[in-house]
Amino acid sequence: MAATDFIVAIELGSTKITGIAGKKLPDGSIQILATTSEISSDCIRKGVIYNLDKTTQSLTSIIKKLESTLKASIGKVYVGIAGQSLRTIRNTEVRHLEEETKVSQELIDTLMDSNRMAPIVGYQILGVVPQEYKVGLDLTIDPVGVQTDHIEGRFLNIIARNSVKQNIVQCFEQATIGIAEDSEDLIAPLVLAEAILTPSEKRSGCVLVDFGADTTTILIYRNNILRHLAVIPLGGNNITKDICSQQIEEEDAEALKIKFGKAYVEPTEEYDENKIFSLDNKCSIQAQLLEDIVEARTNEILDNIANQIILSGYENNLMAGAILTGGASNMNKLEEAFSKRTKIQKIRFAKETQYVIKGSELPKDGSYNTLMALLAAGKENCCLAIPEVITPEPIKEIGRKDIEGQLFTMDGESVEEIRKQEELQRQRAKEAALAAEKAAKEAAEIERKRKIECEELLKEAEGFKEDKKFKEALKRLSKAREMQIPEKEGAISTLEKEIKKLKEENSIGNKFAAIFNKILEED
C-alpha cells in the first residue's frame, strides 16, 4: 500500500548522503518508513558540496530508492546546512532615542533587521540568536515595554560562505527535488542540539560536540541560549588517513582504527615492542605505532575543541558538562582523552536522540542522530499531491478468456495509451508543483530584498537626521513609504515625526539667531 503522509529528510555527509522517510505518530513517536544512502566521498568534503553533478546524481538515486519503497512520489524534502565555514560571530546594534520611549516589538524588529544587514564579505547570515538587550544600564532578554532613551541589541549571527547554501539549492534544483519551505535555513547542528540536549543541560550550560568523519562541530549553550558554534575541519577520517600513511589500504586502516585504536593510553601502560595488530592476516601494524598515531591526531582534535570552549568565554559556566555524539565519538577511551584535554569531568555520550523510534531499527552509535533530528524537525507532508486521474474500465472480453491483444475501453480508446497519458499527467503535475514552489520562493526572495532596501532607506534617513540634513532625510522616508511595506509603516511614521519636530526646532532656532545677529549689527 502506498504511503501518502510522510516526511523526508536528507543529510549531506562527508562519507555518505543518507535519505530517510518517516511518519510522526499521535503518541509522539516516529515511524521509519524507508532509509537509503549513497557514497559521497567523491562529491562532498568537510560537509560541503564541491562536485555539483555527482551530488545531483546521488540525490536523484536516493529519491528514486525512497519512492520505490514508499510507492509514492516525493514532492519535497528537509535538508540541513552544516560543514566547514559554519560558525557564529557577535554583533551589537545601538539606537539612541530622542526622548524616553517605551520599547516596542517593532523597535526590536528594527534592531534585528539592521543586524541582518551587517556586511560580511563572502558570507551570508543563516540565522540570528538574540543574546541580550542593554536598556539604559540594565541587561535583559525581553526589553519590550521598558522605558528608555538608549537600547543595544546584542546578537549572535550564524554565518557560512555564500557558496554553501547556493550549492545545496542548485543541486536540488538540478535533481528536480523541492526543498521544504520551512527547511530553507535549517541549520543541522542546531536541529541536532534540540534532539539531544535536555532543557536542564541547555539552562545550566553545556558543550555539545558532534564528532563526524571530516569535521567536528562544537555548540555551547547557557541559560537556554546558543552562545557559540564552530566547525573544526578535522574528524575521524583524519585518523584513518594517518594510518593509511603506513602503506595500508583505507578500508583496512578504518578497520584497524575501530578494532584496536585508543584515544587515550595510560602513561603507566607498558609497551611491548613486539606486539602487532593484524586483521585476519590481511594487514598488520606495530601496536605502539598505531596507538601513537591515533592518540596524536585525537589530541589535536580535542585541543581544538578546548580552544573553542575558551574562545566562547563560557569555559567556567558549563555546569552540565559535555555531551558527545556522532559516528566518530565511538572511539575507545574517548571519554578519558576528552576529560584530560578539556578539563571537563562531566561527560555524557548521546548514542541516539530523545525521540521514540518505531519500524526499522537504526544504528545506535550516534551516526544517525543528525538525520533523525532533521526528520523530527519536519512539519510539512513531503508526499507529492497529484490530481487523481480516473482510469476507464476496460471492455469485458467475450468468448475465450485467453485471447491476447490490445484492450480498448467502451469508447474505443486504447487502455495502454490511457495509462501512458496518466503517467504523462502525473509527471506534468509534479513539474507544475515544483515550478509553483520555485515561483513562491522567488517571490519571497524579492520581498525580502525589498524589505532590506526599505531598511537601508530608514538607516540613511537616520544618518541624515543626525547630520541635520532634514530635507534629505524626509526624501529617504518618502521613498521608503512608496515601497508600501506594512510592517515598516510604524517605524517610518515615528522617524518622520522626529525629523519634522527637529526641523521645526532648528528653524525656530535659526530665526532667533537671525534676530539676535540683527540686534548686534544695529548696536
Language-model segments: what does each one mean?
Residues M1-K16, I20-K76, I81-C206, A263, ...:
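Nucleotide/phosphate-binding catalytic cleft detector across ATP-hydrolyzing
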Residues S68-T69, G83-Q84, N157, S163-E173, ...:
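Phosphate-binding glycine-rich/basic clefts of nucleotide- and phosphate-handling proteins
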Residues A9-I10, G19, V79, F172, ...:
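Residue-level signature of catalytic and energy-coupling elements of molecular machines
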Residues A72-G83, S312-G327:
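Short glycine-rich phosphate-binding loop at a beta-alpha junction
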Residues I10-K16, I81-A82, E201, L208-T215, ...:
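A short acidic Gly-Thr/Ser loop motif
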Residues S312-E315, K333-R348, N381:
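ATP-binding/phosphotransfer module of carbohydrate and carboxylate kinases, centering on a glycine-rich
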Residues I485-L495:
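Boundary/linker segments of alpha-helical solenoid repeat arrays
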